Structures are given as C-alpha cells and as structure tokens.
C-alpha cells in the first residue's frame, strides 16, 4: 500500500449501524469484527469493506485463486507467496493515528485446515463445496473507536466509486442517532430449532482420556477439544437477528459476523488469540491456565 493513497476521514456511524451494514450488504461489507468492550483491550469495532482478490480452499481440497497469480496448490503456501509479493512499507502513522486498519486481508481458517498441516488427524470430512479456508484482500473499513465514540472511514487505494458505495449504504440507514434494527426480530433458538445433532458423548469422553494420556506422557502441555453441534432450523434464519441475539446473550470484546461463500459465520469470544504489531507478538490465553484452588486435590473435587 502506498501511504500517499491512504484516506482517513471521520463519518457519522454508530456500532448498531455497522452491524446493520454487514447484515444487509454482505457483498460490500464481508465482515464485522465487533466489540462490546469499553476498555483498551477491545477498543475497536472494524467493519471491513471493498473485497477484492481472494484465495478460497474448498472442502474437496481444490484451491480457487481469483485475481491472484500463483501456481501453488497449497492454500497456506499460496497465501504466503501472495502476502510476500503484496507487502509494502507501512503507511505514515501520522495519517492513521492509532487506527488498527490500513488495508489488509480478511482471513478465515477452518478447523479442518489442520488436516492440511498435520496429516493423519482423521478429522470429520467437510462437504466438497464447503469453505475450508479463505483469504480476501480488503482495502477499506469503517472503524469505530469505543473509547472516544467516533467512527472513521479508512481507505487504502480504494476506487472512488467503491468509497461512494460505502457512503451511500451508510446514508441509506438514516441519521447516526437513529436505531438500526436488524432485518428481522431477534430469534428464540428454542422455538426456531427443529433438530439438533452433536458428537456422541462417548466419543468426546474418549478424546478427553486420550488428551490426559498425551499430557501425562509429556507429548503436549495442553489440549483444546472442540465439539460440534448442528442445528436444523424450522425456517430460514436471519443472520443479523441471530447475531443480535448472540450479542445480547454473550457480549464479548472479540465477536464477528462474516459472510463467506455459501455461509455466514457468527462468533463471540472473550479472548484475543494473538496480536502482532511490528516486532511485538502478544498472546492472551485465558482457558486452562490457572488453578482454581490452592492444591491439586482441591482442584480435582
């Protein structure tokens, strides 16, 4: 990114309006990184916009490159090659202040991508057309600073017509002080669910026992077990309404609403996995890292 092409200006937009934009215009706004925090840890909500070239790995292992010149058939290898070729000097910090976005990539890595890194894991198979991983270039974003209560439009080499489309979508919501309700009322998960499928309890217990054996043998110091649920709904779900319900039930500093090919991704987490700023790498794990009581015996009860 050329620092001279960077545009930053303040706009009138509330967090509720950012949530409405990602729900109503997924083609222009592919993902919202949402925060309910009031402190510095989850200071920003970032609505990325203007999606461009992409790498898409399907469940059948096929890599789709759109606007990316690569002969690499491996997703991570192709992404590393692309990132290295597109990397430039950072923009002048005076232009962005403390803004966390200056143009970049929207990246989704599914659990199943682990099977491409470490073979022999025997993970559940994805549908052939499902998204396993995605990397997409994004050049613009609406960034809301919760500490000072203002929103800025950041555009790094974004076409003028795309910036105009962003501003038009925001203006169509009405004044910043107006309520930006989701497209449908909040859903009751109990009333809306037709069928629930989950991993058999015995299978999960076996995984716990294996993890304990690995820890005792010194192979690992921690094992994170994931358990999936599949819900079949009685009627089509409105992603914006579901995200509003999730946000009320589990407010978090690190939440997301993303639109991927053929799917919507909603998440809510209290934990930031990793932050990289220059030569500084920061991780803040919060699960399974502290004893509950003073002795191992007390912890076991």
Positions of PLM-derived features:
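Extended alpha-helical targeting/anchoring segments
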Residues: 1-301
């Amino acid at each position: 990114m050329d620092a001279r092409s960077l545009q930053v200006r303040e706009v009138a937009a509330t967090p509720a309006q950012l949530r409405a934009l990602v729900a109503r215009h997924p083609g222009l706004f592919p993902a919202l990184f949402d925060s309910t925090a009031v402190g510095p840890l989850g200071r920003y909500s970032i609505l990325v916009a203007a999606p461009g070239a992409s790498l898409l790995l399907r469940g059948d292992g096929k890599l789709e490159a759109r606007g990316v010149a690569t002969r690499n058939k491996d997703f991570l290898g192709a992404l590393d090659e692309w990132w290295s070729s597109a990397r430039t000097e950072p923009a002048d910090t005076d232009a962005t202040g403390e803004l966390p976005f200056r143009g970049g990539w929207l990246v989704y890595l599914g659990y199943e991508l682990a099977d491409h890194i470490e073979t022999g894991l025997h993970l559940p198979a994805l549908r052939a057309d499902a998204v396993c991983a995605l990397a997409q270039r994004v050049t613009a974003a609406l960034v809301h600073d919760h500490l000072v209560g203002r929103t800025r439009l950041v555009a790094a080499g974004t076409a003028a017509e795309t910036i105009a489309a962003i501003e038009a979508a925001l203006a169509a919501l009405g004044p910043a002080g107006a309520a930006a309700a989701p497209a449908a009322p909040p859903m009751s998960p109990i009333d809306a669910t037709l069928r629930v499928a989950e991993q058999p309890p015995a299978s999960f217990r076996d995984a716990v026992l294996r993890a304990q054996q690995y820890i005792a043998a010194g192979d690992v110091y921690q094992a994170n077990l994931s358990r999936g649920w599949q819900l079949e709904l009685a009627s089509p779900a409105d992603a914006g309404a579901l995200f509003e319900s999730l946000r009320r039930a589990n407010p978090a500093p690190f939440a997301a609403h993303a639109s991927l090919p053929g799917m919507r991704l909603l998440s809510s987490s209290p934990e930031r996995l990793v932050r990289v700023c220059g030569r500084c790498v920061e991780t803040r794990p919060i699960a399974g890292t502290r004893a509950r009581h003073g002795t191992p015996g007390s912890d076991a009860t």
